[in-house]
UniProtKB/Swiss-Prot annotation:
SUPFAM superfamilies: alpha/beta knot. GO terms for cellular component: cytosol. The keyword S-adenosyl-L-methionine applies. GO terms for molecular function: tRNA (guanine(37)-N1)-methyltransferase activity. It catalyses: guanosine(37) in tRNA + S-adenosyl-L-methionine = N(1)-methylguanosine(37) in tRNA + S-adenosyl-L-homocysteine + H(+). The gene is trmD. This is tRNA (guanine-N(1)-)-methyltransferase.
Amino acid sequence: MFDVTILTIFPEMFPGFLNYSLAGKALEKKIWNLQVINIRFFAKDRHLTVDHIPYGGGAGMIMRPDVVGDAVDSVLSTHKDTKFIYMTPSGTKFDQSIARELVGFPHITILCGRFEGIDQRVIDEYTPYELSIGDYILSGGEPAAMVILDVCVRLLPGVVNNSGSITEESFSYSGGVLEYPQYTRPKQWRKHRVPKILLSGNHKKISDWRQKQSQVITKRRRPELLDGEINDKFT
């Protein structure tokens, strides 16, 4: 089973959209397990304070290391070999290859930051794997954690009925390029027709056409993928 623990100050956000579609069904079938821990439970005062102003001045608030550290320790006490992940815009950009590596761990822990982030000493103490889902800023790490889990869960055996759906989609198809165009009925819609090659029944020609289209689309939209930048970045 793929076992996941989330550390957050907003536990009510989970499972969120993960409770629907493939991830939700997989959760019901116990293909994966989700535990959510409220970081505020480890606060040191009656107000359940988890943040404070930054030393040296600056905007916003920083999550306290003593509070976050105790929350992390609570997980490590029962999951010593967990893969500890911290969601941060300055982290390694998440991709399909990283997702494939993550599902190989029996347990992962995802720390969701808030405010201006967590005290650097938490990172120095635990050296988490810092991950980002893109070059933009969210209000917190929770939505990013859900994105990562959605990608990972659908890779688990028994989640997607047709394994070909996984192997032929973008970043998995033909060495990590973008997926080829897809068509279904009707054969003609308005002025647009399905390419004749897809109606030919010649599987070799169809496969060649799809590979060529993937290369063309990737070169136009994400040329860096053809230079080998999609690879195993997981450390």
